[in-house]
Amino acid sequence: MLYSLVKKYLFSLDAEDAHEKVCKILRMLSSSPFLCNLIDSQWGYQNPKLENEILGLHFPNPLGLAAGFDKNASMLRALMAFGFGYLEAGTLTNEAQVGNERPRLFRHIEEESLQNAMGFNNYGAILGVRSFKRFAPYKTPIGINLGKNKHIEQAHALEDYKAVLSKCLNIGDYYTFNLSSPNTPNLRDLQNKAFVHELFCMAKEMTHKPLFLKIAPDLETDDMLEIVNSAIGAGAHGIIATNTTIDKSLVFAPKEMGGLSGKCLTKKSREIFKELAKAFFNKSVLVSVGGISDAKEAYERIKMGASLLQIYSAFIYNGPNLCQNILKDLVKLLQKDGFLSVKEAIGADLR
C-alpha cells in the first residue's frame, strides 16, 4: 500500500529524475547500518533451501539485482537489505563519462517495461572503487560490470577493458564484461568470437576471480552459441543472458533510441536462455535475466538451467517487497515439486 503511493508520485516524474531521487535516499540509507538492518527486518528473507555455493561464493539466494541500477557502487549496502542474494554494480568504465543526452530513460507502463539509452554514464573506475570500499565488506557477493568508454575506438577496445579491469581488481567478487549494451555505438560489434577470446584470455591472466560475459538477446542463435563457446574456451566462468533488446516491436509506443527491459522481454529472453542452456548447462554457470517478475518465471528459468537470476525493471514496478515475495513463493514451488533445495531444481528440465 505504501509503495503504491510512493510509486504514484515517482511515476509522475521523469523516469531518470525519479531514479535519481531514489538513489539519493539509498545512498543515505547505506551510511546507516541501523537503517539497513531495519530494512532487512522488513523486506529481507532468509531460507536455507535457497542457499548455494557457486564458484567459491556463497549466495544466500539466487535472486540478484542486475547492473545499471547502482552504476557507481554507491548504495550497495542499502540495496542488499531488500532481500537480494547478490548485486551487480556498474557499468563502470575506465574514465568517467556523462552518457547520452537526456531524456534517455522511459517507462512503458502498460507493458511494465523500461527503455533506456543511458550510455554507461558513471563516475569512472577510480571513483567507483572508492564508493565500493566505503561500505565494504558486504554480506552478499558483489559483481562488477565493466564497459568500454564511448570515445575509445574499436581497435583499442581490448586495452580499454584491460584498463578498467586493472583499476577494479581489488574490489568485487566477480567481473562481468558488458559487450551487449545497445547504447554505446558499435559496442555490440565486439560480440564476436575473436574479440571475446582475446578478452577472456587477457582477463584470466589478470585475476583468479570468476569472469562472466553478458550477451544480447538479439543475436542469432548460432552466433550466440559460437560467441559463448569462444568465451568459455578462453576461460569465462559464466554467461549472463540477456541484456536489453533493440526489438521495438515488443512495446506499443517505443522510443527511437535505447534498449527495452521488463515484461516485454520475458519471452525473448527465455527463448535465448533455453538455447544457451541446451548447449552449455553443466559446462558453465548460467545466469538468466530479462522479464523475470514473479516466482513462477524465476522457477522456470532455474529448471531451465539458471544457477542464478537477475531482476531490474520488476524492482521498479513492484517495489521493495518484490524479492521477499518471489523468494517465499519460490520456496513453495520447490516444496510442491519435492525439491529439498534450489540446488536440486537447477536444470531439472534438462535431466
Swiss-Prot record:
Highest classification ranks of the organism:
Bacteria, Pseudomonadati, Campylobacterota, Epsilonproteobacteria, Campylobacterales
| Reactions this protein catalyses | (S)-dihydroorotate + a quinone = orotate + a quinol
Recorded hits in InterPro entries, A to Z, give: Aldolase_TIM, DHO_dehydrogenase, Dihydroorotate_DH_1_2, Dihydroorotate_DH_2, Dihydroorotate_DH_cat, Dihydroorotate_DH_CS
Cofactor remark = Binds 1 FMN per subunit.
Q: Which GO terms describe its cellular component?
A: cytoplasm; plasma membrane
Which annotated residues bind FMN? Answer: A67, G68, F69, D70, K71, T91, N145, N178, K214, T242, G262, G291, Y312, S313
Organism field:
Helicobacter pylori (strain ATCC 700392 / 26695) (Campylobacter pylori)
SUPFAM superfamilies the record matches: FMN-linked oxidoreductases (SSF51395)
Q: Where along the chain is substrate bound?
A: K71, N116, A117, M118, G119, F120, N178, N183, N243, T244
Presence of keyword Glycoprotein: no
- Enumerate the GO terms in the molecular function aspect: dihydroorotate dehydrogenase (quinone) activity; dihydroorotate dehydrogenase activity
In Swiss-Prot or TrEMBL terms, this protein is called: Dihydroorotate dehydrogenase (quinone)
